A protein has these predicted regions:
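Conserved TIR/SEFIR loop-to-helix hotspot centered on a Trp-containing motif
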Residues: 111
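Glycine-rich phosphate-binding loop at the start of an alpha helix
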Residues: 114
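Nucleotide and nucleotide-moiety/phosphate-recognizing core
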Residues: 2-107, 118-133, 140-145, 152, ...
Length: 198
């Protein structure tokens, strides 16, 4: 059976719930609700996980209990625990360089300044071949404001827009399994471009 490990990045603790930096872990929780599965703690992966099946794919949802800057600890442990290759991992994370609620898929690449991705690449010994789902949170405008910006909660209107866009992106996981990576990317990005034009 094929496997796809989805890891939603964020910071643990109630004080970080619904902050911009936790967009990835928020998306995984939405998936859990959508597929009616519960997350269970697992010390060996430094986080919690849930599993379900789509066609012949075993889908594993994981949220690290490490802080964002140490995400690589959990991802490397989960990779070993679930016996998956890097290309079978989809990291879901917040993205400053995309406007609020914009969803993009990316097949490998660098860390782009994202400390969670930086940690993952470091703990995978430089391997950056894992896939990514980038959830736009917008940019504060000034680099000196980034830390406080990502660790704070968005406005009510921003939050609603982000939640609506993330909910509409939930079917992407099934599409990845049924239609494959390339077709799913083309469909997602073409629909986003049409929205931008309208």
């Amino acid at each position: 059976m094929n496997t796809l490990l989805l890891v939603g990045l964020g910071n643990p603790g109630k004080e970080y719930l619904n902050t911009r930096h936790n967009a990835g872990s928020d998306f995984v929780r939405m998936l859990c609700n959508d597929y009616q599965v519960s997350l269970a703690k697992e010390k060996l992966v430094h986080g919690c996980y849930a599993k379900f099946i789509i066609n012949d794919f075993s889908i594993i949802l994981c949220i690290p209990d490490t802080f964002m800057n140490e995400s690589g600890i959990s991802v490397s442990k989960a990779k070993k625990f679930f016996k998956v290759d890097s290309h079978e991992i989809l990291i879901i994370h917040d993205e400053l360089d995309l406007h609020n609620g914009c969803i993009r898929l990316k097949d490998s690449g660098g860390h782009g300044g994202h400390n969670g991705l930086r940690s993952i690449i470091d703990h995978l010994n430089g391997d950056s071949s894992f896939k990514r789902m980038r959830i736009g949170i917008g940019h504060p405008g000034k680099n000196k404001d980034i830390v406080s910006y990502v660790l704070n909660k968005p406005s009510e209107s921003e939050r609603k827009n982000m939640e609506d866009k993330m909910k509409s992106a939930l079917p992407l996981i099934e599409s990845l399994v049924i239609n494959g990576w390339e077709k799913t990317i083309m469909k997602l990005h073409s629909s986003e471009e049409k929205k931008d034009e309208s």
